[in-house]
Amino acid sequence: MSAGDVLTILFTSLMAMVPIVLTSVGAAWSERAGVVSIGYEGVLLISAFFGAIFAELAGSAVVGLIGGVIVGILLGMLHGALTVYLKGDHVIPGIGINLLSLGIVPFGILAYWGTAGQHQLPEDATMWHLATPYGELSPMVLVTIVIAVVTWWVLFKTPLGLRVRAVGENPEAADALGINVERYRFWSTVYGHALAGLGGAFMSVDWLGLVHKTMSGGRGFIALANMVFSGWNPLISLIGGWLFGFFEALAAWLAPKHIIPGQFILMLPYIMTLIIVAGIIGRARPPKWDGRPYKRE
């Protein structure tokens, strides 16, 4: 492996980390407030689909990214309404979003573009990239880093973040201090899903330039693993997300080399996810009220 190959893998890993980091950061904020969602895989897929539609209609990738955020917000409001205000189970709505994506995206691609399973976006609907000898970089890489750092700073260094963490650790005490637990939990859920929506739209209108019925590729679940690996810390999620992106980039580099069987190469990012998660089981410390509905008495 030459120095150029190493740089190619590193550049690819920066692109691959974006949807994982954005989703991990959003999930960490939401769970710090006490709301669990396992529906980020579906959010990524649905927002990738609708982001592509918005981008094509407007002829602008930026509009597509905004469209993905809007889709994430709507799905987050749905999840928040069911879990925060209706006191429903936190897992079931996420499963519903994942199942919805498996139906709506393949059908939508066929109905809207008339193609089976995949559609290539025109050039004017995709984001420009900075070209280098070792690969291309999107401005979304920098945006993702800024979002992770700012989210960490707000969560751990500001009164707003203190209140968010309070409703996830001890909502009864927070309520007694006059903090509106339901409001903070609801909007934290919306923020988490909005970031996942941005990550989904990034995949279609920026990174890959296409829509595919399975393009999320398990990244929503990998992002949740990264969130746990990072200890619900958005800043560490940035490092963990790059690590997962590195293994995905390494798999992409190895695939045409035929050094090891292709099936194993495709499994590599998921094998590393299992190894990392297995290594932290029993040591992870989620917020005390994570996933528990709060009912004011």
Stretch-by-stretch model annotation:
Residues 8-10, 155, 192-225, 256-261:
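Inter-helical junctions in multi-pass inner-membrane proteins, predominant
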Residues 8-57, 65, 70, 74-91, ...:
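Single transmembrane alpha-helix segments in multi-pass membrane proteins
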Residues 16, 23-24, 48-52, 102-106, ...:
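Hydrophobic core segments of alpha-helical transmembrane domains in multi-pass membrane transport
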Residues 29-47, 84-97, 163, 187, ...:
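Short, non-helical or kinked segments that cap or interrupt transmembrane helices
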Residues 60, 134-211, 234-239:
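Helix-loop-helix "hairpin" substructures at the membrane interface of multi-pass membrane proteins
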Residues 81, 85-110, 121, 144, ...:
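Pore- or pathway-lining transmembrane helices of multi-pass membrane proteins that form conduits
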Residues 90, 101-157, 257-265, 291-297:
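Transmembrane helix-bundle core of multi-pass membrane transporters
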Residues 151, 169-183, 254-297:
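Cytosolic-side transmembrane-helix boundaries in multi-pass membrane proteins
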